[in-house]
Amino acid sequence: MKNITDSFVSVGHWPSAGSFEFNTDILATNPINLSVVLGVLIFFGKGVLNDLLDKRKQRILSTIRNSEELRRGAIEQLERARVRLRKVEIEADEYRTNGYYEIEREKGNLINATCNSLERLENYKNETLFFEKQRAINKVRQEVLQQALQRALGTLNSCLNIEVHFRTISANIDILGSMEEITD
């Protein structure tokens, strides 16, 4: 406390001229010098500090604006992605539904085609069996006829001797002769 009062008391006392010294005792320094230095610092530092604060404020505001724009862009992209997702889900459901219907329709078509093929094969089988049966019947008829002819020839050959043969020929000649007389 004494130092403070001493500094105010010694206002009228100036150090000798010709020497320049820094007074490191803050409480002993001249309040006028301090007020001048502080005034200069405030006057010049205020502009620099205001410029620094304004630049910082502008950077913060531009960062906030950029962040807001990015946020809006992200929200728009999210909405577009949601819309696309809904469309894709709807299309997937349609494809799934159409796929099930298509599978059932193809299954029915395949079953119908298989039934038709089986029916045609059954008809071909029946026709083939009928033709094979007819061929077998015709073959048996031919063999029976051939055997009957061979027996008849055998019977005729055994029954006919030369005398019967001549009588048959003479009888046929007489029949032909009488037919000629009728036609004349």
Curated annotation (Swiss-Prot):
GO terms for molecular function: proton-transporting ATP synthase activity, rotational mechanism. The chain crosses the membrane at residues 27-49. It is a single-pass membrane protein. F(1)F(0) ATP synthase produces ATP from ADP in the presence of a proton or sodium gradient. F-type ATPases consist of two structural domains, F(1) containing the extramembraneous catalytic core and F(0) containing the membrane proton channel, linked together by a central stalk and a peripheral stalk. During catalysis, ATP synthesis in the catalytic domain of F(1) is coupled via a rotary mechanism of the central stalk subunits to proton translocation. In plastids the F-type ATPase is also known as CF(1)CF(0). F-type ATPases have 2 components, F(1) - the catalytic core - and F(0) - the membrane proton channel. F(1) has five subunits: alpha(3), beta(3), gamma(1), delta(1), epsilon(1). F(0) has four main subunits: a(1), b(1), b'(1) and c(10-14). The alpha and beta chains form an alternating ring which encloses part of the gamma chain. F(1) is attached to F(0) by a central stalk formed by the gamma and epsilon chains, while a peripheral stalk is formed by the delta, b and b' chains. This is ATP synthase subunit b, chloroplastic. The lineage of its organism: Eukaryota, Viridiplantae, Streptophyta, Embryophyta, Tracheophyta. The gene is atpF.
